[in-house]
A protein has these predicted regions:
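ABC-family P-loop ATPase nucleotide-binding domain
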Residues: 1-22, 233-237
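H-loop (His-switch) and adjacent beta-strand-loop-beta switch element
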Residues: 223-235
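ABC family nucleotide-binding domain
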Residues: 11-226
Length: 237
């Protein structure tokens, strides 16, 4: 069954059809995902919720073009991912998808400014535009005053704000956040979700974030509940 969460002519930013993902575990195969079909509309703040080991990260890796399904099809931003070669897929991912991780994944020897700027350096953006975008994103996440500080000088919440700015600085169509509040206290985690939500509305960027905390469901436009690798409770808030 395909879950179509919104009606309308706009193509979804993500479309999965009968997706399965198996991993080898010695002589046997372990099913991480089983028969997942879903559609996520554009300009949507979506959540994947489920316990640890339910398949959330595996699903994000498929949507993020980091891994390929064992069965089924994955379309992202209107493109069939299976049609890309390795180099084209890497370029597609760099242009269209931003990533936010629970452990922040910041470069420790770079300042907050340099961490946010780094993706723009990789694509060869002109210095003036690079500086404009970097400063604008740091301001958007409330870290203009901390631009020259390194990660070890920042709190956990500030590090995640840097990671959010870095994910958005290339103006991607889709941002994926894997347990973005897992290493934060409750109040800081709530502020990070609220920040992502505000930026999503302002920039009209699609967000998909995973969490094991069902209390965060109220922040999402749409939720998918995953258990034992299967989509068990799609819903619209």
């Amino acid at each position: 069954m395909t879950v179509q969460l919104t009606a309308g002519a706009e193509r979804p930013v993500v479309r999965l059809r009968a997706v399965a993902k198996n991993y080898d575990a010695g002589a046997v195969q372990v099913a991480a995902l089983r028969g997942v079909s879903l559609e996520i509309p554009q300009n949507c703040f979506s959540m994947l919720v489920g316990p640890s080991g339910s398949g959330k990260t595996t699903l994000l890796n498929l949507i993020g073009c980091i891994d390929a399904p064992t069965e089924g099809t994955v379309e992202v931003c209107g493109e069939a991912i299976a049609a890309f070669g390795d180099n084209a897929l890497s370029d597609f991912r760099a242009r269209n998808i931003g990533f936010i991780f629970q452990n922040f994944s910041l470069v420790p020897v770079l300042s907050a400014y340099e961490n946010v700027e780094y993706p723009l350096l990789l694509v060869g953006m002109a210095p003036a535009e690079r500086r404009r975008r970097t400063l604008a994103m740091l301001d958007a996440v409330g870290l203009a005053a901390q631009a020259r500080q390194r990660p070890n000088e920042l709190s956990g919440g500030q590090k995640q704000r840097v990671a959010i700015a870095r994910a958005l600085v290339k103006q991607p169509q889709l941002v994926l956040a894997d347990e973005p509040t897992a290493n934060l206290d409750t109040a800081t985690g709530a502020s990070i979700i609220e920040l992502m939500r505000r930026i999503q509305v302002e920039l009209r960027t699609s967000f998909v974030f995973s969490t094991h905390d069902p209390h965060l469901m109220s922040h999402a436009d749409e939720t998918f509940t995953i258990r034992d690798g299967a989509l068990v409770q799609p819903g619209l808030h």
